[in-house]
Structure formats: C-alpha cells, structure tokens
Amino acid sequence: MTVSRLRPYATTVFAEMSALATRIGAVNLGQGFPDEDGPPKMLQAAQDAIAGGVNQYPPGPGSAPLRRAIAAQRRRHFGVDYDPETEVLVTVGATEAIAAAVLGLVEPGSEVLLIEPFYDSYSPVVAMAGAHRVTVPLVPDGRGFALDADALRRAVTPRTRALIINSPHNPTGAVLSATELAAIAEIAVAANLVVITDEVYEHLVFDHARHLPLAGFDGMAERTITISSAAKMFNCTGWKIGWACGPAELIAGVRAAKQYLSYVGGAPFQPAVALALDTEDAWVAALRNSLRARRDRLAAGLTEIGFAVHDSYGTYFLCADPRPLGYDDSTEFCAALPEKVGVAAIPMSAFCDPAAGQASQQADVWNHLVRFTFCKRDDTLDEAIRRLSVLAERPAT
C-alpha cells in the first residue's frame, strides 16, 4: 500500500505511454530517449573498464577522475569553478541528484517553488521531503514561453526554502534568457533561497539561444546546486551517471541524502564518462546540429499535418497544439493516439500539478498542448509523421 503523499505519483505517464507504445508497436515520440548510441570511444572505455575489473563500489562521491572531468568541463564551457574534492558529487542520474538535493536541503513543512510545467520527478520528491509545492507558471511569449518574474517574486513567503529551475526547459523547449536568470538571482538572494538548477540539456540549445548557468550570476555561486548528466549529452540515458555541483556546505547536504538512496552506482561507466567529458566536445557539437535539424524536420511535418507548433530552442522536445485538427483535450488525444495512428506522445498536463493550489487551473491552460520528442533517427521521425498525417485526412471535427 502506497503512503498517501505518494499516491498521486504511483505510475509515471512516461512509463505508461512507453509500455503502450511497445505493446502495440507505436512510434514512441513520448519518452525522451535517443535511438542512437553515444561516442564510440566512450562506449569502448566502458567495455574496457568492465573487462579490466572496474565492477565493484566506486568511491562514495564518485571516482576522482570523473569529478575532475566534471569540474574541468564546467570551467571550460561556462567559466564556473568547482573544487572536485568537495564541490562535485556523482549521482545515479540527474533524477537522483534532484531528489537528494531536495531531501538533503529542504526541511519538512517548508515551501519549494516550482516553475510550471515541470519535469515529473520534482513534485514527488518535494512530497517525499514533507515540504509544500508552490507553482509559478511560464507564460506564452509569441510562439514560445517566458518566465513571469513578478509572479515568482509574489510566490515567495517566509516559509520558502528552495526554488527548482530547469533550463533548457523540459517540456516546452524554452531557454531562460540572461534577463530572466538575473531576475531569478535577485529574488533568490533577497529571500535567501537555495536554488536547485536542472541543466541536463545545457549543451542542446539551438538558433540564437545560449545556455547560461545560474551559478554564474552575482550572489548565486554560494546558494546554487547545479545538476547535469551524461545521459542527454552523450546519448546514454541507461547509464544513469549524473552529478551535482555547488558550494561544499550544500553538497554535503546533498551527499548526506544521496548516500542512503543508492550509495554509489555505475562504476565502469564513470571512467567512460570522464573520458567523454574530456575529449568529446566535437561529438556533442555534432549531436546538437543533428538535433536542430531533426527538430526542424518534425516541426515541418507537424505543421503540414495541421498542428500549431511552438518554437523550441533547446532540449529534445517541442510542443504542438492539436486544436486546429479538432482536438481540444491533449490528455484524451494522447491516450487515444497510439491505437488510433500508432504514435505515442505526452500531454502537457502531465507536467502540471493539480495538487498544488493554482496548478489545477494551470492544468486546464496547458491541456491543449502535446509534447513530442525529436531525439530519434530521421527515418523514425518520418514514419511518425506519415502515421500522424492520418489526422489531417480524418480530423476530429
């Protein structure tokens, strides 16, 4: 029997949609995992590590070479310095890092601010910590989405302890601007908040967008836990190698929780990820270019079918509105889509939290949108577009 605070989160929509897609042979544009492998040298390094006996517990904070590689990568790309001995912690994916940060730094009864819509693990880990969620929605901005800084400022109360920020943003594909990040920094400093930043798509930004780590803004280095992962950077979502970077005092809190979640993980994958961080910048750049082209390919196909497609400047995802085709409820639309046309997608309402006050209203606002992933091979995207074209031939109304 599941405890009451976790009953709303018993099964994720991603697991449900992926299982349905597998069962009926649908093209899975719902869950964000690529169908191509990462850098060959990284894959070989993992095989070599296994063959070489790197199969027992690694050090609790992560292997020293990986922590050094993470710190060097942050410095090289973003100009942010971390001591690999005390300010870098290797985790079992970014999801564990997020959970450990909340569990290790947020007291029961305090409030955590979430920007809605949000990745589905945020809300349950806040519940696990015994804290309260307070949501602040993104707002439409032309063909994209933007932060309402005034709404964020109003949401802060004396009980607010932490703020979780995700940019590049899953599910919308928005990338927070320097102006938006500066506003977040000003609010966080004024209210003395801990900020947990989920930056797993930091290298997957397109067009004019630029990823700026919040830790680099004035007053933020001492209060920010920056979380990232090898999964999206190197097409290895199943390896579950993530990390958290931040001031030693905060990282100690994250580690205190993390050590009782998984203790350690992925011993033979850690040297492989270290190698990739040190040597595969060109591979990541090629991945970014490929994803930009695939985003354009999927967006063009959806537009031709009749969807209204929103701009995506980062991540694996874009949002589309099926109302021009006669579908007003994306939850119902996505539930029927696999069997109707053989494609799986995720309703935007899955990223909203109806248990968190005003979020129940926001679920209605977002429920006309659908999230599709474009991190698939061209032939996979083309087949999905071919199947979805049935909707243009037989619209709902």
UniProtKB/Swiss-Prot annotation:
Pathway it works in: Amino-acid biosynthesis; L-lysine biosynthesis via DAP pathway; LL-2,6-diaminopimelate from (S)-tetrahydrodipicolinate (succinylase route): step 2/3
Catalyses which reaction(s): N-succinyl-(2S,6S)-2,6-diaminopimelate + 2-oxoglutarate = (S)-2-succinylamino-6-oxoheptanedioate + L-glutamate
Residues annotated as transmembrane: none
Domain of life of the native organism: Bacteria
Compartments (UniProt record): Cytoplasm
EC number: 2.6.1.17
Principal place of residence: cytoplasm
Keyword Protease: no
GO BP: any one term: lysine biosynthetic process via diaminopimelate
Gene Ontology, cellular component aspect: cytoplasm; peptidoglycan-based cell wall
Enzyme's top EC category: transferase
MF annotations from Gene Ontology: kynurenine-oxoglutarate transaminase activity; pyridoxal phosphate binding; succinyldiaminopimelate transaminase activity
Annotated coiled-coil segments of the chain: none
Family, per entry: Belongs to the class-III pyridoxal-phosphate-dependent aminotransferase family.
Family matches, as PANTHER family: FI04487P
Protein name according to UniProt: Probable N-succinyldiaminopimelate aminotransferase DapC
Source organism per UniProt: Mycobacterium tuberculosis (strain ATCC 25618 / H37Rv)
